[in-house]
Each structure stands twice: as structure tokens, then as C-alpha cells.
């Protein structure tokens, strides 16, 4: 696993050689140079949460790490909030993410196109108290046709009538 660290950003990915990470690294380097901060590249070692400065906002992006050891990642999800850490866990299958520490500590779920089985499970887990499955399917279908890289948002910090369900980030459903 490769890792880049700045004072304010941490990107963790299984394969940093991908074009998107090369772009992100270049962009981050330019940003850090302007902010007089440094990016450090590490291999196969997650920094300890105790080393994160709680006085600065830190963003951690975990991408394509579902098959990696989850214990260090789980620590960030369960304890990171208290140290000013915001975590993003990017994966292809929501229900393969460890439940107790990662899924249960999620505030916002962003969904790209889903098959019927996963859509039903997401509905049953997060949505069933607010709308029936037919309405949820309609909402999801509208989200998926909104633009080229469409997605649906379920914001678990909000009420159903106050932006909990959105198409992209800006269009509330209920």
C-alpha cells in the first residue's frame, strides 16, 4: 500500500501508479509548495493516529484497500473524528466494507450505479423508514440519469425532509 502525507491531507491507495494518483500527486505537490508544506511518500505503513495534529483538519482517502488489513483503517474511522480527521473509503461493494468500525461510522454514503440486490440492501439498511422501495428506486433512477457521472447521496446526519437524499450534492429529493 502506498501513502502520501501532507500536514492536511493523506491519500492511501493500493496502487499509486494509476494516472489519477499521478495527477493528484502533482496537484498536491503544487498546492503544498504554495502552502509551504511537504508531501512524503510512504510504502506499506499507515501512520499512527497519534501522529495526526488535532489542530489541523486532515482528510484521509482510502481507495481500493478493501482487500488490505482493515485494523489500521478502522482505527481512523472510530477515533479519527476526535483528532480532526475526515475519512473517505472508496470501494466497489458497500457491503464488503467492515461494518462495526467503518460502515457504522459513516455519515455520508455516495452511490454510483447499483444492481437490484445492493439497491434493496441499501434501502433496507438506511431508507426504509423514510420511503418505500418503489419510491427509493424512482429516486435512484432519477439520480443516475442526472448527468454523465451521476450519483446519489444519502446523508445520515440529516432528516429526510432536510437534504438526507440528494442527486449529486445539490438537488434534494424529499
Where does each model-flagged region fall?
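Conserved P-loop NTPase motor cores
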Residues: 1-138
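Extracellular/periplasmic catalytic domains that process cell-envelope and extracellular macromolecules
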Residues: 53-54, 144-146
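A general structural signal for short secondary-structure boundary/capping elements
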Residues: 134-140, 155-160
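Conserved P-loop NTPase motor module
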Residues: 145-174
Amino acid at each position: 500500500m502506498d501513502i502520501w502525507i501532507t500536514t492536511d491531507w493523506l491519500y492511501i491507495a493500493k496502487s499509486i501508479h494509476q494516472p489519477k494518483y499521478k495527477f493528484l500527486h502533482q496537484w498536491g505537490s503544487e498546492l503544498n509548495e504554495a502552502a509551504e508544506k511537504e508531501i512524503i511518500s510512504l510504502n506499506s505503513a499507515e501512520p499512527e493516529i497519534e501522529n495526526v495534529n488535532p489542530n489541523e483538519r486532515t482528510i484521509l482517502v482510502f481507495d481500493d484497500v478493501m482487500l488490505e488489513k482493515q485494523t489500521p483503517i478502522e482505527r481512523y474511522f472510530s477515533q479519527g473524528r476526535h483528532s480532526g480527521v475526515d475519512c473517505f473509503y472508496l470501494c466497489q461493494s458497500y457491503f464488503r466494507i467492515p461494518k462495526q468500525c467503518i460502515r457504522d461510522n459513516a455519515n455520508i454514503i455516495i452511490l454510483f450505479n447499483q444492481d437490484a440486490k445492493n439497491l434493496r440492501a441499501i434501502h433496507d439498511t438506511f431508507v426504509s423508514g423514510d420511503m418505500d422501495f418503489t419510491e427509493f428506486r424512482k429516486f435512484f433512477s432519477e439520480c443516475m440519469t442526472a448527468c454523465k457521472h451521476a450519483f446519489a447521496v444519502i446523508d445520515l446526519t440529516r432528516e429526510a425532509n432536510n437534504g438526507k437524499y440528494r442527486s449529486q450534492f445539490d438537488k434534494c429529493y424529499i
